[in-house]
Structures are given as structure tokens and as C-alpha cells.
Amino acid sequence: SDLTPKYFFTLIDAPGHRDFVKNMITGASEADCAVLVLSAKEGETDTAVAPGGQAREHAFLLKTLGVSQIILAINKMDDSKFSEDAYKIAKEKGLKLVKSVGYKIENVPAIPVSGWTGENLVKKSENMPWYTGKTLLKSFDDFKVPEKPVGKPLRLPIQDVYSITGVGTVLVGRVETGT
């Protein structure tokens, strides 16, 4: 969908539940950038970034699949009553995680949000006057369009194969290089 004045985005939801890791891999393999969502709720970020945690697994997969640009969204700020301390704790743990998998933390914004109340998603939150950065949507404009190596031979990794009645076998993939 058309989200910002600068770019055209297609959003792919990759659920954080372990049962949907295959979907996350499929989505991430098609992505140029990502939003990694952590929780400001006490204890939830600890679980997510711990060994075996979903955020840890997702950060590793994003980096492995070539997603070089990410935003940390610190969600559930409403649960912590929009506490700056809760944000800072989750942010610190999130930045430590993404640094450990190879991201440069100076290029990773951490944005406090509430998906439940819509705080700081599109419009600045009045409940977080201590946060002076951009909203999540405005931060999308900071993503850079990655250069595509069109001068190289065609490389199209196949992600799935469908057998469609009346059509035949259809391969699904993404052109990584070439034209």
C-alpha cells in the first residue's frame, strides 16, 4: 500500500509465534527492510531476546536473509503507563540483540509505540512527551532503497511451487539479481 509521501510500501506481517517461523522466513526473504517489535511490558522483552526467544530468532533470520535495515518498535507502552524507563530498558535490550547479530545500532531507531491505543504509530503521542523522535510511519521514510545488482546474471531463488489446475506448475520466487 501507499503509506508515505516518499516511498511505496508493501507490508508483510510475520507473526512472532513459533508456529509461524516458516511464514516469517518467507516474508523476510522478500523484504528490503523490517520492523522488529519488542514489548515494554515487564519480562516480555527478556523472554523475546533470550536464547530461543522469538525476537532473537527473527533478528538472526533477518540479518541472514539480507535485510540490512531495521527499526525497533517498542510496543505495549500503554501497559507500562507510557514509562520512559520501561522504554529505555526494552530499547537497551533490543539494541544489544541487533548488535549481536551484526546490525550497526547507530542506524537502528527505537520507537515507543502502542498498537492497542495507536500511540506514536502515525501521529505523535501526547502520553510520551519525553520522546522527541519520529513516529513509526515517519521513520519509514528514513529507509534507503537498496541497490539491485541488475547487471549480473539472473538469480531467482524459488520459494514455492504450486500446481494449478488448467495452468500447470507455477514457480514462486524473487528476482535477486539480473533482469
What is each residue range found by the language model?
Residues 19, 45, 81, 120, ...:
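Conserved protein kinase catalytic core
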Residues 88, 95-179:
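Conserved catalytic-core segments of large NTP-driven translation/proteostasis enzymes
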